[in-house]
């Protein structure tokens, strides 16, 4: 069996990991063994949090809509129910944006939701 030398592949793999670990503190950006662990863990966190981000933003939108709806004497759940009955299909992201930046338009939506209930 012929001898196999793998120095080139190992060097390339190490360089790739160390490049990904650029900006990390101390040994995490300089030592392959430590950098590999740091990069792997960072990848796990990134994967998990890309999914978690969707939940977090939905919670934020609901909190903003609820706060704006309560300023107009209506709860979040009754507001959403009223919009559904009024056949107004605006997603929570846009509703939250309207609630923050256009109070008059949001108040009009609340009135339409109240009328539909």
Swiss-Prot record:
It holds the Pfam family Ribosomal_L20. GO terms for cellular component: ribonucleoprotein complex; ribosome. One of its GO terms (biological process) is ribosomal large subunit assembly. GO terms for molecular function: rRNA binding; structural constituent of ribosome. It comes from the Bacteria. Keywords: Ribonucleoprotein, Ribosomal protein, RNA-binding, rRNA-binding. PANTHER family: 39S RIBOSOMAL PROTEIN L20. Binds directly to 23S ribosomal RNA and is necessary for the in vitro assembly process of the 50S ribosomal subunit. It is not involved in the protein synthesizing functions of that subunit. HAMAP family: Ribosomal_bL20 (MF_00382). Belongs to the bacterial ribosomal protein bL20 family. This is Large ribosomal subunit protein bL20. It comes from Aliivibrio fischeri (strain ATCC 700601 / ES114) (Vibrio fischeri).
